[in-house]
Amino acid sequence: MYEWLNALPKAELHLHLEGTLEPELLFALAERNRIALPWNDVETLRKAYAFNNLQEFLDLYYAGADVLRTEQDFYDLTWAYLQKCKAQNVVHVEPFFDPQTHTDRGIPFEVVLAGIRAALRDGEKLLGIRHGLILSFLRHLSEEQAQKTLDQALPFRDAFIAVGLDSSEVGHPPSKFQRVFDRARSEGFLTVAHAGEEGPPEYIWEALDLLKVERIDHGVRAFEDERLMRRLIDEQIPLTVCPLSNTKLCVFDDMSQHTILDMLERGVKVTVNSDDPAYFGGYVTENFHALQQSLGMTEEQARRLAQNSLDARLVK
């Protein structure tokens, strides 16, 4: 069934470009930029990927991102991801990038954006993959820093379709960023937000009611709140679910416990995505395949999940 799943046309709506940095490319960029790494070789780095929770993953993720320095680096990162998409028949992508991860290291905003945009344009022209780019704020940083990032983004407003919210969830509720999101919407941006991954269902309510998001990234803890489930079904609010990520970060102890198919059968508009595939052991097809292997996902369910991803695009 893997080949059939691979050939299924699909969109990816929850993907962090920095999270596609495979160990081989990380080492190549470190060499190109003459950066000393704390790992001796690719295999040592792969072993470091045995993290146990979101914070351990984020610590490794931000350390790895340090090799991204030049416009060419960001182009190469994005282009490598798009080639994976082509191989898996991902026909549309709406990736996140985290400018603060780079501007806080002294990399100019425009350098980051130029490399990513050039690769996305080439992906559309040469690979036929349509796209919309989402600027994501880091929630463990302050509201003031998010406002500053929005200031930096406004001269390039035509480069983005939406703003989002990611990073360490617990203790950083969506309400912390309500004013930034209000301002972003007034400037013409759509909004999305990570909520209900490690954080409680209340964070999903806040994302919907205070940030007024078009869709929820993750959202799996909605299953704990029947009233919230009813709203997601009634309003057909998409959830961009990332199964391999959820098990790797221990949101679920095992894939057999994942609720995505239960939510699908109840009428929630769930989609399948890879989140940070270099770190979580698989791109979109591998996520679909894991559901088939562990939960007995049928072809009919896979078709619905793929169609949901195409229907939930912000760029139609």
Swiss-Prot record:
Segments crossing the lipid bilayer: none
Cofactor note (record): Binds 1 zinc ion per subunit.
First-tier enzyme category under EC: hydrolase
Example GO molecular function: zinc ion binding
Cofactor: Zn(2+)
Enzyme Commission no: 3.5.4.2
Binding site for substrate: D276
The reaction(s) this protein catalyses: adenine + H2O + H(+) = hypoxanthine + NH4(+)
Gene Ontology annotations of biological process type: adenine catabolic process; hypoxanthine salvage; nucleotide metabolic process
Source organism, top-level taxon: Bacteria
Binding site for Zn(2+): H14, H16, H194, D275
One Pfam family from the record: A_deaminase
Site entry (Important for catalytic activity), positions: H218
Active-site residues, record numbering mapped to chain: E197
Keywords: Hydrolase, Metal-binding, Nucleotide metabolism, Zinc
Family statement: Belongs to the metallo-dependent hydrolases superfamily. Adenosine and AMP deaminases family. Adenine deaminase type 2 subfamily.
Role, per record: Catalyzes the hydrolytic deamination of adenine to hypoxanthine. Plays an important role in the purine salvage pathway and in nitrogen catabolism.
Stored NCBIfam families: aden_deam, PRK09358.1-6
The protein, known as: Adenine deaminase
